[in-house]
Amino acid sequence: MARKNQKAPWEPEEEYILVSKSEMKRDMDALQKLGEELVELKPSVLAKFPISEELLDAIKDAQRFKNEARRRQLQYIGKVMRQEDPEPIQAALDKIRNKHSQNTAVLHKLETLRERIVEQGDSAIDDVVALYPDADRQRLRQLARMATKEKQANKPPKAYREIFQILKQLNDDAVSDSIENELKQ
């Protein structure tokens, strides 16, 4: 019988967390899939990730390989990733995906604005000038009239595209100005 101040021999001193073999395999597969996503990235983007040199070299090798060698290299990347913390890597990857979806949303917003300019004319142009004070009202009116005429004459939508390019430039300028203002503060 154990004494009062001692633990019984059948009571473990530390609490063990038992992980099933299938759960370990799922975790390893998830790391390998994360590695596959890293292999698909461009080297310039990959350089910004918080990964070790060994993993970076393995990813660069996998980008060169084809077929079976690539599959084996991806398994090796999964093995190397087991020694690294996947959280910051996943966070950086999510940030890149989010940035892409934000850019797509901005482009859709600009396309909608272009449609309004062509269809509604001056009222939509007034909204654009309110959003972007640097906008050239006269040039936008001229392009809106030209886009309408091109559409009626079944000509290529040159003015239509130019409106979009102007809106995109105005948006880019507004974003860069806001970034500069944040840096000054």
Swiss-Prot record:
UniProt-listed HAMAP family: DarP (MF_00765)
Molecular function per GO: ribosome binding; rRNA binding
Protein name: Dual-action ribosomal maturation protein DarP
Function: Member of a network of 50S ribosomal subunit biogenesis factors which assembles along the 30S-50S interface, preventing incorrect 23S rRNA structures from forming. Promotes peptidyl transferase center (PTC) maturation.
Originating organism: Vibrio vulnificus (strain YJ016)
InterPro entries: DarP (IPR006839), DarP_sf (IPR023153)
Gene name of the encoded protein: darP
Highest taxon of source: Bacteria
Protein family (similarity comment): Belongs to the DarP family.
A Pfam family this chain is assigned to: DarP
Compartments, record wording: Cytoplasm
Gene Ontology CC annotations of this record: cytosol
Origin organism lineage: Bacteria, Pseudomonadati, Pseudomonadota, Gammaproteobacteria, Vibrionales
GO biological process, one term: assembly of large subunit precursor of preribosome
